Amino acid sequence: MGNDLRTLSAPSLTILNNPAVIAVSQDPEGRSVTRVRRELNIAKDKYGVGEIQVWSGSLFGGDQVVLLLNAAGEDAQISASLEEIFLHDGPEGSAPQVSEEWEVYDLWGNRMDDALAQKILDADDKEVEKLWKQANWYNATEMSYKDGLKKWDERLMGKKIGKIAPGGTLSAKVKRHSVEMYRLKSIGHGGKRKVHAKEEL
């Protein structure tokens, strides 16, 4: 982090301390996400820049992370089929994961609210510890992200928002110049798979 923690704002704290997102960056598999789609024929911003991208990557335990990036000049409905999401595991829908059912977790769905974040920033050391415990916030010094993922700690999953049927599609309204981030968890079974990395992030 390149920011000054002494002048950190509440919204910034809620971004930096999101355990569901941090768990992806600390994933034991240590794999990169790959871009599976890029669209340029969309609305541009005032600088003449605009595109939509879909990124996907495998996670610990057979989970999958999916990012829907809207770098366009207006809000957009972005969809990604399981065939696209698991493109590097098998072309033209041949990946076994395409025929599975998946639970969808919004990794920003349980983000700390700004009011609590401000209380934490304003509190002294003793009060801060109390606030963290009351919030039941994930503490990586007490349990590593790897161990938390093994136990399927709900604080590392985000907010469950639905399911994707076999052969189905993930779809979301994404605000301009923003990104939505999801964890997919197979219902029934996950499993190891080959990863054919292309354009990595």
Where are the predicted features?
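Surface-exposed loop/edge segments in extracytoplasmic proteins
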Residues: 111-117
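Active-site-proximal substrate-binding groove within the catalytic cores of carbohydrate-active enzymes
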Residues: 1-110, 123-128, 135-151, 174, ...
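C-terminal beta-strand-rich structural cap/linker in extracellular carbohydrate-active enzymes
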Residues: 119-200
